[in-house]
Amino acid sequence: MDANQKLLDFAKLLNQKNDSRPVIEKLKDNISGDLLNYFLNLLEEISKLDTDQPLSVTSLRCLQLFVHLTFLLGVYTQLPKEMLSQAKIKALPIYTPKKNLVQIYNILLPLLLTPSLLQGPLNLHYADLLLLHLYLLNCHEQGSLIEEPRPLFLDPSWKEKVTSIMSPQMVDPSKMISSCLSLLQPNVDNWLQDKLKHYLTTCLCRETGVQGFLKVYMQAQPNSIERARQAAHLISSVPKDISPQKYFSCILPQVWSLFSTQPRLASQLIIAVTNTHCDIVTSFLLKKLQILEAPKVIDLSPFENALDVLQVLVYIQNDDIIRICESCVPSLLHLQENTTLRSKVQDILLRIISVCGTKSLLRNLTNAKHLRIFCERLTKSQLAMFLPNLLEIWVQQPPDKRLELLELVQYALSNVDSDEIPSNVMLSVCTNLINEVASQNKYSSTEISQITTNREVEEENEEILLVLLNIISSVIGRNAELDLENPISSLLPALEQLSNYSNREISDLAKDVYKTLIQSKDDYSLALSYTQSDLVPVRGQGVYMLRKLIEKKDDRINPVRVLHVLINLLRDENSYVHLNVISAVVSLCDKYDDSLIRLLKEYTNTNKFTVDETLLIGQAIYQTMERQGELVAKFYGQIEQTCLSMLNNENTDIKISSLNIARLLCQMTSSDAFIESAKNILILEMGSDKQFLRRAAVQLLDSCKHLPDSVITTLSYVGSHDKDDFIKESCLNILANQADAAKYYLQ
């Protein structure tokens, strides 16, 4: 009977439904002689079968079982128990093998080397064969292998073959790493622990070792951040038998390659290594990023590779990594000249200034043209934040560089709205610069109007003064709420002196700015009085002035009083005033936390306000939540209770308003109460006048990540039977999204 037929016969035997005995008991009754010897002989027979010969699934499973039983009876029973896992120890049968471990090793090892039908089943037990190999190797080193036969690894003719399947330098890294990790049991002897760790280190230092380790380690939880951190910690731990420099010289190039395929894992690795060996990481990254300093781009590939890595690095929240990114700014500014790379370069620069501010762009400025290219990419808001530092650098430049930067300063000024400029920062910068220019040698210590003999320097300084004074004039023109606190108090003396300056344009401008600042002293009272004016534009200006005072958290602001004033202004009949009031209320809630709580209480006070006024308060709450984003979660309980209360209101528009607020909250955090309320609306509110209420309920459900089965059932019904096409289509989209989310979760 050939080996294939034996497999089929044993498969039938083992699948007998009326025989519930253990597998080994069944086999003992049908095999004459020693079980282990029979299995080993059968495996040798199978190894001689034609590899193209098809095996049924049943035969293959039977073969896998025989290989497993061979290890169970021949290997597990003879190895020390501390080397085995608890599962293997529990599975041990009462059996004494007639072949020792060396004999079994010498049979199984050639089978693994020979291309045959056994390759797959044996590789499933590769870790066990590796364990047997290491055990026998240790026995040999301890001098306890003195009897025949000798293990094959001692046979010179087999040495190279054994190395090819047992050496960590030859075997596929992921296969070896997986085996070593599975063998690292808590109670294994120190010699085995050291040997396995050495094998792991050897694998990690190979060209694809890190990738192999991550493939194995992350397999259980591929999307887990915590698992990724654990993997990074293990890889960044330097083994005892190798220096950090040598170890990371093998690891870091692999991490660099990972940035293109697994950026999230590469980031965790870089963070872990930086925390323990910052100098090594810094040196490595700077050397790799040095390509960006090349004067010309000949081959795009290395530049794109470096930029791809840098694009990931700029999002790592680590000060040392950020400093490395910052050091690349001059090179990045220069690389903007390459049209292919420009977009990616500018994205990186934008991220750097969002983290480090704009000074990093100016600290090593060598070419104003490069900076101008970047500034053209900035939004007005970004340009406004950039302007103060640009002015500082401009004034501090040597005379031959100022003219080059002046064009950029003028470009920035002409493209920034005056109310976009950060007022206090800008005024502080301009004040310091005016005092600096005014104190230069062209003036005496007492007379700022004294003319220097060096006319060229004076003209240049006059140009600077004009720019700075115009900026200040523009800022205070849109910020009537500025008081005489710093930096204004330190600006007034310089303005007084400049009022007597010989250049008429400068003196007139200085007088005008000085007068405006003095008159702005009592702007808070002025703003409140404006809100009571009969003229719509004046009321609007009063609200605008209050909003600006709120946004800078002026000490004179009483949040309770101001909220009361603003809510009363919602009764104003003019929509222009409404819009300004809502913006001011949003700013108040953003700056003073308790204001949102008070606003929620006012929202529920429907006896005090008309429906339209209640809806405007709801709009203010909605916009406040939009501005605060995830920070609004701290008011989750109050917002949820308020919305649930308002859903009981008889007015449909008020219900829709509360559903819109609830929808925004559900985008940030889940609420079973909101989901249930929306479901009930779809079931109960069926009239034609409830169409928009039902739409709002569907939109709320669309904002929820996970919906219970009862809601899915409701959506399925509504999606098929509702008369409103918008509602039907929305329901079907929600169902599709929920199905996709469930599919992703299962994967």
From Swiss-Prot:
Alphabetical list of SUPFAM superfamilies matching this protein: ARM repeat
Keyword set, alphabetical order: Cytoplasm, Nucleus, Repeat
Cellular location(s): Cytoplasm; Nucleus
Cystine residue pairs: none
GO CC list: cytosol; nucleus
GO BP annotation list: protein import into nucleus; protein secretion
Coiled coil regions in record: none
Repeat positions for HEAT: 37-75, 103-141, 320-358, 381-418, 459-485, 486-523, 557-594
Main location, first listed in the record: cytoplasm
Family from the record: Belongs to the Tango6 family.
Function description: Required for the cytoplasmic assembly and the nuclear import of RNA polymerase II.
Assembly information from the UniProt record: Interacts with RNA polymerase II subunits. Interacts with nuclear pore complex subunits.
Name this protein carries in UniProt: RNA polymerase II assembly factor rtp1
Source species: Schizosaccharomyces pombe (strain 972 / ATCC 24843)
Upper taxonomic lineage: Eukaryota, Fungi, Dikarya, Ascomycota, Taphrinomycotina
Protein's gene: rtp1
